[in-house]
């Protein structure tokens, strides 16, 4: 469909570039689970180099698409889950980590696109999940069976969900005693029974019905094809459940995901900035104003702001550490600096 096609094209680039020898070093990695070459978007970070290459990869893809390519949220959710399941098993003697590794092997073998499903619709922000007027405002377990669990709720602003094979559901906030039903992490196919996806409106989306003229980034669109995903009594077998009731790990889980995700911004946002800066320079050239001192100052400032964001992402990657689980985790403080600079600099650049 013309209103969805650009987002499909953008996600497809994460597959096409992985098959291009020119970009193989950034787009692929060696799985520590199987020893095979896998798409980096399905990889669990095994070194500082992996963390750095993630940022460089994202800048490169963004330079080619000028938009969101949608696999980053799932990528970060998988890496956060790898650490969290290990830590839960260590404390409680559960078997989440082995389950997760088995599922990760399946994801890698099939190069699946995973949507990270964290953000709930939330309702009254002053109340914890178990105190909401409507229990479905946060995703939660409504039934435990011998063969699995049944969940209800909704996940909002789901980047890339419409193009993904599966979603990795995780908590969205710190949880307290009484919130056990909301401490759920699991993997679910996007077309499982009981799931409805509501595709969000996009800027100038109806113009695409008339062709490519005046539609902005007509090939790849401008955002990530977000959905509101409703979960209406969705069954999840136990071998796809990676947290169930461990409220004391929810906050750390969310924090790890957030740090990994903030690391990205100095990659993808800077790649998008590269496109904008290049276009601005070209427009100035066509108008005969590129040598004007004011224009040169503005372009220089745009480059400075973009490279500052990139430096922050590289810094939090190079300062990463090896976790007891065996994977590598970014420096949280510096990852937060990425976020702070990006939320300011992107607006100044544009």
Please place each PLM-identified region on the residue numbering.
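Alpha-helical interface subdomain recognition
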Residues: 1-43, 50-61, 264-350
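Alpha-helix initiation and N-capping motif
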Residues: 8, 75, 97-101, 135, ...
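Conserved short loop/turn motifs at secondary-structure junctions
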Residues: 86-93, 120-122, 297-301
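Well-ordered, non-transmembrane segments within structured domains
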Residues: 95-106, 221, 238-265, 281-304
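A short, Trp-centered hydrophobic/proline-enriched beta-strand micro-motif
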Residues: 111-124
